[in-house]
Amino acid sequence: MRALITGVSGQDGTILASMLAAQGFSVVGLVKPGTEYSRLLRYVPGVEIAEVDLADHSGIRSVISSVAPTHMWNFGGFTAPGDSWDHSDEVFAVNVDSVRVMLESLQRVSDSPRFFQASSASIFEGVDRAPQTESMQPEPKSPYAVSKLEAMQLVDGARRDLGLFGVSGIFYNHESPLRGVGFVTRKVSHAAARIAAGLEDRLELGDIEVARDWGWAPDYVRASILMINAEVPKDYVLATGISHRLSYFVEKAFAAVGIVNWQDYVFSTSENTRTVDTNLMVGASRAAYLDLGWRHTIDFDSMAAIMVAHDVAQLADPKATWEI
């Protein structure tokens, strides 16, 4: 079996590559030219890397033709919703146009390939009801969210009209030690470790009472494997169904390094506060539980502790890895 993964050097791509390699897959990963991927190679030494920009349609076609994947996951693309208004051309080029090219190219592969599209809860950002389900009408507001919905529609069309086994997983927030430091949960775990070590003395955040449906990233990647291998291709909401405030994550992260009085180190600043936030984003994954047998393996408190423990380990050894 041959897997092709876009965005392979990111959190989800690295976790997926590790899981698939353990299952005996031959794994090829796409990264944007110039991307640093040494971390990926520490986790999955045998992965083959192809440097292709998702805006390079001929490059995408060439890789798919040469690899002839039996399974393909699209985890790549523009991933910063807040910046999407300033980069809308890029957003639609890499989040929508590239998906069309992938689907067209896969049609020419003879092994009846299967395709997974990583979608986003942001397609529901304008919905004022919670929890959100697969049957709800999406209400995207940002260019990023619109691009994610359009990509889903392309996959649905390829499934319906072309007979391609294509599915979209509607991912809610999911975290792990491999999350980038630019994401708020990793920013918190990283700072907690450094403050406990005496390397920093404050952490500046935006609104710490913002609430999100945060889950454990490896569980979501496992869901994508279940979806792409299912008998019937269907789209699913992938979420915990539980909302937590950021302040609670901060509390648990600092507690993991023995700091109870976290309020002495954490400060909310207007510079870090979003001018417009989304409605309450909580997903209902009952369909995935029933159809796929999907389950969560790590709770919220444990997730915070694991992330902090890895950041502590990396203070001693920057190349320390975490067992996926």
What would you call each of these model-derived segments?
Residues 1-174, 298, 322-324:
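N-terminal Rossmann-like NAD(P)+-binding domain of SDR-like oxidoreductases, especially those catalyzing
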Residues 29, 185-186, 192-324:
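C-terminal substrate-binding subdomain of Rossmann-fold SDR/epimerase-dehydratase oxidoreductases
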Residues 43, 52, 56, 180-181, ...:
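Residue-level signature of the cytosolic catalytic core of signaling kinases
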Residues 136, 140-147, 177, 181-185, ...:
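The catalytic Tyr-centered alpha-helix of NAD(P)H-dependent dehydrogenases
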Residues 59, 98-101, 150, 187, ...:
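Charged catalytic carboxylate motif
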Residues 146, 150-158, 187-191, 249, ...:
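Hydrophobic alpha-helix immediately C-terminal to the catalytic Tyr-X-X-X-Lys motif of short-chain
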Residues 15, 42, 62, 86, ...:
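Generic recognition of short, well-ordered alpha-helical segments
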Residues 116, 130, 167, 181, ...:
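Residues that recognize and position ribonucleotide moieties
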